[in-house]
Amino acid sequence: MRSVIVTGGSRGLGLGIARKLIASGFRAIVIARKLSEEFVAAKLEVEQTHPGSLHFEAFDLAQIEAIPDLAKKLRKDFGPIYGLVNNAGMSTDGVLAMTSTAQIEQVVRLNTTSPMVLTKHVVRSMMASGGGRIVNIASIVAFTGYSGLSVYAATKASLIGFTRSLAREVGRAGINVNAVAPGFVSTEMTQGLTEENRQQIARRSALKRMVDVEDVANAVDFLMGDGSKNITGTVITVDAGNTA
C-alpha cells in the first residue's frame, strides 16, 4: 500500500482528500495540530472498509525547525513515502494596511515556508525510492486576487512558482509535482462568506455553482494516480469555471 502524507487533513478539504485517496487504495497519513471530531468519526468509518489506511500524526507545521525530525519519523513508521499533499494553510481577513507584520509572517510561515521545508525532506525519500507524487494546494486567488486576501494570495502564488520549478528539478528522479487551485470551497475557511457572497461567486462561474470538497479531492486523486504519469509542473483549476 502506497503512503501519502496529507497536511491539514484533520477536517474539511484535507480530510476529504485523505478519504478519496484511501478509496483509491492509498494509505493516508494526516498531519494536523490536533484531532477533530470530524477526523475521529471518519477514522471509525474508514476502519470498517479500509482498515489500517488512515493515520494521524499530531504536529504543528509552523514549527519549521522540527520538520526534519517529523520526516524521519514518518519514513521510519510507514516506510517509503509515495505522495505528499501540501494542503495545510491559513488566512487573515483584512486589508494589507491594517495587517500586522506578525500576522503576515505567520501566514507566510505556514503557507509557504512550511510546505517547502517539508517537501525538501520528503522528496529525498522519494528520490531514494525511485519516484513519487507531490501536489500543492494553491488557490484561484493567486490568479485573480481578492480584496482582503493579499497576503494569502501571495503565498498561494508562491506555491505555484514552487511547483513549476520543483517539477523541473526532480522530474529526472521520477517525481511528478503539480498543483491544484480550487475556487471557493465550502469548508471552515469560507464560513465567513455570507449567502450573498456565495451567490455572487456562483454567478461569476461558468457553471453557476460553487465547488465541493469532493471536486478538489478528485483532482488530487487523479494527480496521484497512474493516469497522470506524464503530467508535471501543471496547475489544475477546480473552480466551476470561475476563471474561465
What spans do the regions from the language model cover?
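Conserved glycine-rich cofactor-binding loop
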Residues: 10-12
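Substrate-binding pocket helix/loop in short-chain dehydrogenase/reductase
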Residues: 95-96, 103-108, 190, 201
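Active-site helix of classical SDR
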Residues: 119, 155, 163
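Residue(s) in the substrate-gating loop at a strand-loop-helix junction
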Residues: 139
